[in-house]
């Protein structure tokens, strides 16, 4: 449950259980509630996954909207129901109490938020092969992990966005740092163009990449 008692939906491939030994691909959208492009991508992906269940061999977990409080707010907010930027709240070795503004508030302590705690627990429980989270800002594929990770290249080839090693500025307490540096789980961050007027174009940008994965 979110800080405002909203349910956070989770879906997974029918052949797997939420326990160790399945090494799924763990994916999520809506980390920042004011980035609807990431939710649109997750929803398109979920439709495709459910329509092609018998063809997909990979184990997968998908959370369409992690920050349901921020996404449901009017206006939508980057932060969660407690005013915390979830992608600055992971218990990473580089977590910092400092932030460059209210939108980036990292929380009172590392891993303080229920959404972050749920992802950390899910990572420990299922030991994902790698993770993909969906955002929107400037178009790019951010890979924190082995530079030859083929899945990142599939996505890059599908959408035409370059693979970058970081977003271009420090992100203490981020999933990228916690996942790869601290846990050795490769992290792919999809950054779609922000403020799109037509969200229906998002899923087609990445469909071929996910089919190849």
Predicted regions and their residues:
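A broadly conserved detector of short glycine/acidic/proline-rich loop/turn motifs that flank catalytic sites
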Residues: 14, 90, 193-194
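A short acidic-Thr-Gly-centered motif at the start of a beta-strand
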Residues: 13-21
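Short glycine- and acidic-rich boundary segments immediately preceding or forming the N-terminal edge
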Residues: 1-14
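Active-site/substrate-binding loop(s) of hydrolase catalytic cores
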Residues: 3, 21-26, 35-167, 185
């Amino acid at each position: 449950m979110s800080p405002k008692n909203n349910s956070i939906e989770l879906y997974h491939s029918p052949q797997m259980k939420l326990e160790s030994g399945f090494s799924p691909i763990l994916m999520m959208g809506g980390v920042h509630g004011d980035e609807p492009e990431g939710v649109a991508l997750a929803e398109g992906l979920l439709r495709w996954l459910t329509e092609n269940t018998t063809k997909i061999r990979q184990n997968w977990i998908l959370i369409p909207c992690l920050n349901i409080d921020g996404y449901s707010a009017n206006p939508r907010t980057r932060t969660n129901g407690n005013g915390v930027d979830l992608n600055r709240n992971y218990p990473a070795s580089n977590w910092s109490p400092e932030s460059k503004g209210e939108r980036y508030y990292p929380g009172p302590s590392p891993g303080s938020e229920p959404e972050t705690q749920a992802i950390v627990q899910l990572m420990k429980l299922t030991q994902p092969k790698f993770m993909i989270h969906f955002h929107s800002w400037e178009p790019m594929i951010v890979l924190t992990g082995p530079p030859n990770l083929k899945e990142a290249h599939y996505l890059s080839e599908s959408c035409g966005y370059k693979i970058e090693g970081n977003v271009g500025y420090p992100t203490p307490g981020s999933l990228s740092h916690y996942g790869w540096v601290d846990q050795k789980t490769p992290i792919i961050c999809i950054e779609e163009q922000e403020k799109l007027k037509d969200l229906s174009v998002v899923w087609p940008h990445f469909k071929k990449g996910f089919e190849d994965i």
